[in-house]
Swiss-Prot record:
Residues the UniProt record annotates as site (May play a role in metal incorporation in vivo): E94
Major enzyme class: oxidoreductase
SUPFAM superfamilies (alphabetical): RmlC-like cupins (SSF51182)
Family matches, as InterPro entries: ARD, ARD_bac, RmlC-like_jellyroll, RmlC_Cupin_sf
Cited Pfam families: ARD (PF03079)
Record carries keyword Amino-acid biosynthesis: yes
Entry EC no(s): 1.13.11.54, 1.13.11.53
Gene: mtnD
UniProt binding sites for Ni(2+): H95, H97, E101, H139
Co-factor remark: Binds 1 Fe(2+) cation per monomer.
Annotated protein name in UniProt: Acireductone dioxygenase
Amino acid sequence: MSHLVIYNEEGSVLELIKEYEAVSKRLAALGVRFERWKADNELSWDAGQKEVIKAYEEDINRIIKEFGFKSLDVVSLIPENPKKDELRNVFLKEHTHSDFEVRFFVDGSGTFYLHIDDKVYVAFCEKGDFISVPAYTKHWFDMGSKPFFKAIRFFLIPEGWVADFTGSDISLKIPSHDDIASL
């Protein structure tokens, strides 16, 4: 179940929210869009990019029209991937983007950490969750030690994901995806 955990910068829990509407409302107050999408038909894990896009075509077109995205892709990662640790470590570093970061979880799960003011808002996302992180928001992403997810990524610029790392070590103070998933 998707949920939101709010921490102080030292890693102490301030609040745990498990109800979808309350999670969505709290994130909206921060400028973060959080929605639930449903596929037009059931997808297997092996579904390719065309099948995935077709299954969520209505929501994808709505978001593209609203924000003017120039490109999108479908990415996936499984525990057996030999580069999983390398990929995880890149995303675990706090960073910002000059553009907002938009993801939709087709399957599996991942956790977005939003460092806003003196709090860290931890959004555990799973199948059916759409999240949009505002531009210049300090954040990081954890896919866990055994990553399993498939996601649609939306981009305004053809280059896609361009990060500006903050150099902060705050991600070491906040529990990992594996810990958050167990709440």
